[in-house]
Amino acid sequence: MRDIFERRDGDAAGRIGELSVPRAGTTVETPALLPVVNPHIRTIAPAELESTFGAQILITNGYILYGSDEYRERALADGLHDLFDFSGAIMTDSGSFQLSEYGEISVTNEEILRFQRDIGSDIGTPVDIPTPPEASREQTAADLETTKARLEAAETVDTGEMLVNAPVQGGTYPDLREEAAEHAYGTTLDVFPVGAVVPLMNSYRYGDMIEAILGAKRGLGADAPVHLFGAGHPMMFALAVAAGCDLFDSAAYALYARDDRYLTVAGTDHLDDLEYLPCSCPVCADHTPAELQAEDDTERERLLARHNLHVSFQELRTIKQAIKKGNLLELVERRARGHPAMVDGYRALLEAADQLERDDPVSKGSFFYLSGESARRPEVKRHHDRLSRLSVDGDRVLLSEGGDNSRFDETWRLQPPFGPFPPALSDSYPLTAELPERLDDRAYEAAAKGVRRLVDDHPETEFAVAHWGWPDAALDSLPDGVELLRLGADSDHPERDSAQSDMDGDEPKEDYPPGEDENA
């Protein structure tokens, strides 16, 4: 067991945790953002990152320092913390990005690890091989073997108290990501960055990014802190946190500012396209777009970088509050609606509902049904799985969206998207869900799946479904032999079908509207 990371709260696979960084003598609350600091271009001083934005940890490129005539000796003599005037934790990269960009670097794996140790890095990184998304499986597997060897070599380097990253590669092949993660987790290394995802984000391949993260998570233990290398845009933080990422590093705040780009949780705007600033951070409260445009290049870049950091740190606070309230997936859905590619990422996340369900709390606040995607959430899957553990009472059971009826030995409630459940569970999560009046077809289809699960588990029992006009696709998916009863008109629901007949010829109970037998 690794004792540097502790989970405090969670929702879906997202978590609020504490990462202990012994060399820095500090604990970092996660999810955390590591602003990237280029020693040659300090758009915002590290001291300001700490004092104004609350940054507890930052990242800089150890390879740039290693090759810098200006900074190498200063870093060795004074240490990173004095060099940057930063009291929090400092992570260093090894030059793997330069390797992926230029094909070679002028330092060995062991040399760069020792250099990172000697300059006082708190979390160092070996030289892994970032495989581009377009690489073949054979090339990806070969690169992965090299990365594995370098992680094993990193274990033999005396790094003192410095934590060491164990990058998880594997390209766009989730099984290779899982294999890489299992190997990395089996080492004595400490933090687990999911690497080579920047090209996926740059091309808006958020579905592939999520599959890479989920593959890596399958190979890691619950005590493994996960860093999404190169992820710095706030629009995807909630999605990545829900998939299980704890750390993010952002050069975007400065790089985008240099190009007059303005970050939001819904995407990126060019300053020239803005007539209003849709933000209340100190920069946006004190300036109009025209005033920002009137600044000289250096000051405008600095102001935009500050805004970009404010919105990024604010989003992480929003995510943490969503985790505490148990509505992280609802936040993810709202963020996903900002861009079609984010919808792809959200759908890829929900395809792994089985995986998410293992970490998702059994009880939280209200479940809000926001769209057809909500029908695929892990809470719905958990309810369907729970049906296998419930028993029915009697030979004839009614599953009803209305009330009960004397023809049946027992009546269970029926509620899309969850399906059937005994009345005793009516006040339990997630069956207290807030639902729109006009549900989409996927809610009914998910409920029908729950009915199928219950019917299949009780083959000797006769079941009937009393519904308020379910769509044909949901009804057609029910098992043969299930009696279908159409409920009648309801003054509170004028859009429902008004066909009526008494189900058994007896006077129905007061809370059960009359209906018709669709199987007659």
UniProtKB/Swiss-Prot annotation:
Name of the coding gene: tgtA
Role, per record: Exchanges the guanine residue with 7-cyano-7-deazaguanine (preQ0) at position 15 in the dihydrouridine loop (D-loop) of archaeal tRNAs.
Cofactor binding: number and manner: Binds 1 zinc ion per subunit.
Organism: Natronomonas pharaonis (strain ATCC 35678 / DSM 2160 / CIP 103997 / JCM 8858 / NBRC 14720 / NCIMB 2260 / Gabara) (Halobacterium pharaonis)
Gene Ontology molecular function terms on file: pentosyltransferase activity; zinc ion binding
Cofactor(s) listed in the protein's UniProt record: Zn(2+)
NCBIfam families per record: arcsn_tRNA_tgt, tgt_general
Binding residues annotated for Zn(2+), in chain numbering: C279, C281, C284
Annotated catalytic residues: D93 (nucleophile)
Disordered: annotated span: 485-520
Protein name from the UniProt record: tRNA-guanine(15) transglycosylase
